[in-house]
């Protein structure tokens, strides 16, 4: 691959010494690295056996490989690299691929350093004689290769001109004229750039296609009968870069958009004068109605005054009605909230276990359940008929209580009417007595001395 010299061999040896540790860590197993070096007589049989024994004695493999590479450094030969980077080793040790590439790069860099200097310096020493484009530009891409009829055309040796891409050079070439008229953009150090007639015809066709899209205005070209003037104008159109064409197209689009916007604004103003949108409020509606009614009343001043008075009155009424509606809605919402709170509290009171209704109560029986607050018990009608001071109520614990004691147990001792404090089946004893379902004595409890 490379012409081997002493200098190159020395460079490879230095790189080998530099990469010994990397090579040692790239070898992750003993086979076939040790066997390859032994079979090619780079290491002796004794070193081969000692290396295997060291691996069996749990010496790190990378350290053993590094010792072998150090011994190969003493008698370094380029053939060592061929054996080290053989196909078998590269397949068994994938980490060696990157190291192999680094050695190959060393050879490339050495050849580039020792390559004879190019003749480009001699060409640059005499800039007056001119130079070719190929010596300055990098090698062109295949899709940008020049045609055969343009390869022989002379070019000017100008650093600014050569830095441009080949496509821009083709676009900026002027068209030939009967008399070689130099143009301001094409003169470079007293030399002109000729272009073939085919490119001139191609540019003429492209310009003729683009001309109908341009609007008539200040950008229109003034015609002249003289052939020289026509050639100058056509050459100037050819010299227009794509950036200038894009700028002109943007100007045309902006001009057309502004014109359309002006045409659209006029009917919008007319519509606003006749009909007002709902978002403009009551005042704009009043103005629209006033303008209509003034037209209907033949622009009489008296009618206008009457209409304005009526409209003002309507506007006031509308404002007052709106304020009243807002206040009503606010009161409704507050009333709903309060009503909701009341209903919730009423529901809570109805959920008291002493006030629940039970349709299965038989008032003809001598006993029926009663409640007073949180106290529950059983009322005996026969004992109640004897008097309020009699123990006629038996609580849940089985104790006999008088009406007053039962009120104390239910924390209703302060009630003025004990018949309203004691309930049965969700109704007070007063209500049951009025319905004829219960017979009670006088509302005040009798004293013991009576």
Curated annotation (Swiss-Prot):
- What keywords are annotated for this sequence in UniProt? Nucleus, Phosphoprotein
Localization, UniProt: Nucleus
Q: In chain numbering, where does the motif Nuclear localization signal fall?
A: 251-266
Where is the sequence biased in composition, kind Basic and acidic residues?
A: 197-212
Q: Domain (SAND): give its ranges.
A: 358-439
Which residue intervals are annotated with compositional bias (Polar residues) in the record? Answer: 343-353
The answer, when asked if Nucleus is one of the entry's keywords, is yes
Composition skew (Basic residues), residue ranges: 245-267
Q: Entry's Gene3D superfamilies?
A: SAND domain-like
A Pfam family this chain is assigned to: SAND
Q: Where is the composition biased (Low complexity)?
A: 143-154
Q: Which GO terms describe its cellular component?
A: nucleus
Residues of the region (Disordered) are 131-156, 170-225, 238-283, 318-360
Q: Which GO terms describe its molecular function?
A: DNA binding; DNA-binding transcription factor activity, RNA polymerase II-specific
Residue ranges annotated for the HSR domain, each copy included: 1-108
Q: Which PROSITE patterns match?
A: HSR, SAND
Q: What broad class describes the main subcellular location of this protein?
A: nucleus
Positions of modified residues (Phosphoserine): 175, 177, 226
Protein's UniProt keywords contain rRNA-binding: no
The protein here is known as: Interferon-induced protein 75
Which organism encodes this protein?
Mus caroli
State which gene encodes it: Ifi75
């Amino acid at each position: 691959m490379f012409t081997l010299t002493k200098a190159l061999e020395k460079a490879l040896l230095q790189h080998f010494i530099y990469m010994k540790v990397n090579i040692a860590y790239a070898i992750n197993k003993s086979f076939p690295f040790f066997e390859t070096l032994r079979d090619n007589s780079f290491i002796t049989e004794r070193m081969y056996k000692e290396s295997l024994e060291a691996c069996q004695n749990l010496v790190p493999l990378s350290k053993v490989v590094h010792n072998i590479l150090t011994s190969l450094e003493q008698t370094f030969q380029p053939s060592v690299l061929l054996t080290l980077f053989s196909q078998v080793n590269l397949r068994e040790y994938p980490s060696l691929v990157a190291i192999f590439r680094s050695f190959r790069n060393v050879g490339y860099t050495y050849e580039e350093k020792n390559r004879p200097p190019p003749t480009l310096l001699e060409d640059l020493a005499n800039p007056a004689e001119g130079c070719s484009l190929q010596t300055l530009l990098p090698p062109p891409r295949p899709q940008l290769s020049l045609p055969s009829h343009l390869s022989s055309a002379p070019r000017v040796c100008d650093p600014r001109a050569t830095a441009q891409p080949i496509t821009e050079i083709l676009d900026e070439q002027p068209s030939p004229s009967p008399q070689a008229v130099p143009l301001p953009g094409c003169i470079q150090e007293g030399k002109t750039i000729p272009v073939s007639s085919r490119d001139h015809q191609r540019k003429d066709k492209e310009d003729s296609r683009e001309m109908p899209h341009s609007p008539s205005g200040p950008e229109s070209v003034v015609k002249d009968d003289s052939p020289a003037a026509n050639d100058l104008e056509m050459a100037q159109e050819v010299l227009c870069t794509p950036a200038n064409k894009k700028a002109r197209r943007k100007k045309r689009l902006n001009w057309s958009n502004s014109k359309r916007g002006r045409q659209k604004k006029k009917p919008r103003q007319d519509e606003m004068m006749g009909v007002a949108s709902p978002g403009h409020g009551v005042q704009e509606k009043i103005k629209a109605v006033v303008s209509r009614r003034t037209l209907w009343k033949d622009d009489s001043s008296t009618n206008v005054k009457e209409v304005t008075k009526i409209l003002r009155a309507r506007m006031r009424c509308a404002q007052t009605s709106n304020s009243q509606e807002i206040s009503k809605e606010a009161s409704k919402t507050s009333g709903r909230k309060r009503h909701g709170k009341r209903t919730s509290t009423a529901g809570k009171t109805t959920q008291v276990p002493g006030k629940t209704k039970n349709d299965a109560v038989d008032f003809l029986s001598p006993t029926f359940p009663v409640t007073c607050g949180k106290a529950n018990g059983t009322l005996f009608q026969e004992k109640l008929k004897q008097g309020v001071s009699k123990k006629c109520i038996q609580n849940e614990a089985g104790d006999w209580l008088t009406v007053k004691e039962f009120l104390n147990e239910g924390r209703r001792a302060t009630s003025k009417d004990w018949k309203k404090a004691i309930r049965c089946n969700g109704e007070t004893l007063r209500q049951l007595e009025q319905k004829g379902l219960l017979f009670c004595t006088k509302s005040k409890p009798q004293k013991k001395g009576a």
